[in-house]
Amino acid sequence: MARKYGKAARKCSRCGDHSAIVRRYGLNLCRQCFREIAPKIGFKKYN
């Protein structure tokens, strides 16, 4: 039975990890995967 709420309810769509999920804009990526592919999908880092 899948979890319906809580931290383990969602997983990274790229690696399957359950921790530190970025859900904004429907990304559903963990923070590590987001950092790897952010430039490819159009995110820029400003200082």
UniProtKB/Swiss-Prot annotation:
Any Pfam family from its record, for instance, is Ribosomal_S14
Q: Where does Zn(2+) bind?
A: 12, 15, 30, 33
Give the co-factor note: Binds 1 zinc ion per subunit.
Q: Which PROSITE patterns match?
A: RIBOSOMAL_S14
Q: Which cysteines are joined by disulfide bonds?
A: none
Which InterPro entries does the UniProt entry name for this protein? Ribosomal_uS14, Ribosomal_uS14_arc, Ribosomal_uS14_CS, RIbosomal_uS14_euk_arc, Ribosomal_uS14_sf
Per the record, its GO cellular-component terms are: cytosolic small ribosomal subunit
For this UniProt record, give its keywords in alphabetical order, as a comma-separated list: Metal-binding, Ribonucleoprotein, Ribosomal protein, RNA-binding, rRNA-binding, Zinc
Might you name a Gene Ontology BP term for this protein? cytoplasmic translation
One MF term in the entry's GO annotations:
zinc ion binding
Cofactor (UniProt):
Zn(2+)
Q: What is the annotated signal peptide range for this record?
A: none
Q: Does the keyword Cell membrane apply?
A: no
Q: What does this protein do?
A: Binds 16S rRNA, required for the assembly of 30S particles.
| Similarity annotation | Belongs to the universal ribosomal protein uS14 family. Zinc-binding uS14 subfamily.
| Quaternary data | Part of the 30S ribosomal subunit.
**Name under which the protein is recorded:** Small ribosomal subunit protein uS14
The primary gene name is: rps14
